[in-house]
Amino acid sequence: MPQVHIRGVRHGVSAINIASTIQSYTGMGMLQARGAADRAVAGERVSVDVDDFHAVYELADLLTDMGLDAEADESDY
């Protein structure tokens, strides 16, 4: 399954906005998406699974535009 790896977050990016974006593309529940967003904001490396091969690139691009260091990884697809 393709993943998006998040390695850093620019200061001031809202965890709620990150969680909402992750939830929209992954189908995660809000609590799980918020946990991933909180870990990313705290500086941890976070990987999220995306079911759709094309959506993995869209999510990585969107998160990058929001100020995150995000990279698509389709190697597990």
Tell me what each language-model feature is.
Residues 1-77:
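Short, amphipathic alpha-helical interaction segments embedded in low-complexity terminal/linker regions
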